[in-house]
Amino acid sequence: MNAFVTVGSTQFDDLIRAVLKPEFQHCLVKHGINQLIVQYGKGKQAFGDPKSVAGLTILGFDYAPEIESYIHDASIVISHAGAGSILQTLRSGKRLLVVPNESLMDNHQVELATKLASMNYLVTCSTSNLVEGLEELYPKILTPFPKSDCSTFQKVMQDVAR
């Protein structure tokens, strides 16, 4: 089983560093994850030459023309809080842990992640409590995101914009 991490097109080195920490890797292995795939975007230096714990392989890349296949193949997705990445993952039916990039000036990401978490579609956490976020995600029964119905997402976006 694998976990897929995406930072989208913005730089999010804190998330990259957090998923590469041994305590987070051990938590992944504990939950049956044996491969961590990281889309690190502009954060190649933060990704570096990662050291993995026993039982876990780490792969990384900067960008791909599409990430749908990575999401499809993943057991869980750990994502920045960009609307496109969230929607794509929710539509795939995958377990989603969202980590807003708190360094962004207009922090709509926190609002979006918080709203969708309150609706039980995903779990959200910060880079400083990523292990706790993963531990919350695993036993949690999430509400499936409605298929082909953009009204729920539009409502969330309207609520966030207020």
Swiss-Prot record:
Keyword Transmembrane helix: no
Cited InterPro entries: Alg13-like, Glyco_trans_28_C
EC identifiers of the protein: 2.4.1.141
Catalytic activity, as annotated: an N-acetyl-alpha-D-glucosaminyl-diphospho-di-trans,poly-cis-dolichol + UDP-N-acetyl-alpha-D-glucosamine = an N,N'-diacetylchitobiosyl-diphospho-di-trans,poly-cis-dolichol + UDP + H(+)
Chief localisation class: endoplasmic reticulum
Single biological process term from Gene Ontology: dolichol-linked oligosaccharide biosynthetic process
Gene Ontology cellular component annotations, sorted alphabetically: cytoplasmic side of endoplasmic reticulum membrane; UDP-N-acetylglucosamine transferase complex
Function: Involved in protein N-glycosylation. Essential for the second step of the dolichol-linked oligosaccharide pathway.
The family this protein is said to belong to: Belongs to the glycosyltransferase 28 family.
Subunit structure: Heterodimer with alg14 to form a functional enzyme.
Name of protein: UDP-N-acetylglucosamine transferase subunit alg13
